[in-house]
Amino acid sequence: MSRYRGPRLKKIRRLGALPGLTRKTPKSGSNLKKKFNSGKKEQYRIRLQEKQKLRFHYGLTERQLLRYVHIAGKAKRSTGQVLLQLLEMRLDNILFRLGMASTIPGARQLVNHRHILVNGRIVNIPSFRCKPRDIITTKDNQRSKGLVQNYIASSDPGKLPKHLTVDTLEYKGLVNKILDRKWVGLKINELLVVEY
């Protein structure tokens, strides 16, 4: 299955708020949510919805998500927490959380178009796994800095997670440590995803 490129608001109405997918919010008087939420929720449906939330928020394919679940399953700690840590340490997600892009697909495009440097080297793979003490900067040309400048100016510094720091003047971000569960930007029950 390929990455989802269809209407985003349909997914938000169905699954709830997905800040990584889009900044838009559905109208409050929407009847679609009532229609989908009516009746008894089966266990399979609940698990499927949690998995779909995770997939659409982080912009993953089915195969990528299965690979991350497999890696997290090999870890000695809680599989759900390790899964969220792996997803949160992706380069496209860190750019989104630093405020250098408005959405995760926007951050993915910045990385694919070679505007981002990690530790002084160009990285064009959005799934690049960042480690603590990685320094993320933009290229030293006006076009790259201009793309990031608007997003950094409009981002809220109060929403910045504790495991990241950002220097708004130099367009630079730093990964301090691996994140804690409470700073994940998505309301999700990761155990249901692992059980699915």
Curated annotation (Swiss-Prot):
HAMAP family: Ribosomal_uS4_B (MF_01306_B)
Organism: Bromus erectus (Upright brome)
Lineage of source species: Eukaryota, Viridiplantae, Streptophyta, Embryophyta, Tracheophyta
A cellular component term, taken from the record's GO annotations: chloroplast
Quaternary structure, from the entry: Part of the 30S ribosomal subunit. Contacts protein S5. The interaction surface between S4 and S5 is involved in control of translational fidelity.
Record has Magnesium as a keyword: no
Signal peptide interval: none
Keyword terms, alphabetized: Chloroplast, Plastid, Ribonucleoprotein, Ribosomal protein, RNA-binding, rRNA-binding
Known function: One of the primary rRNA binding proteins, it binds directly to 16S rRNA where it nucleates assembly of the body of the 30S subunit. With S5 and S12 plays an important role in translational accuracy.
Protein's UniProt name: Small ribosomal subunit protein uS4c
Keyword Glycoprotein assigned: no
Subcellular location: Plastid, Chloroplast
InterPro entries tied to this protein: Ribosomal_uS4 (IPR022801), Ribosomal_uS4_bac-type (IPR005709), Ribosomal_uS4_CS (IPR018079), Ribosomal_uS4_N (IPR001912), S4_RNA-bd (IPR002942), S4_RNA-bd_sf (IPR036986)
GO molecular function (one): structural constituent of ribosome
PROSITE patterns for this protein: RIBOSOMAL_S4, S4
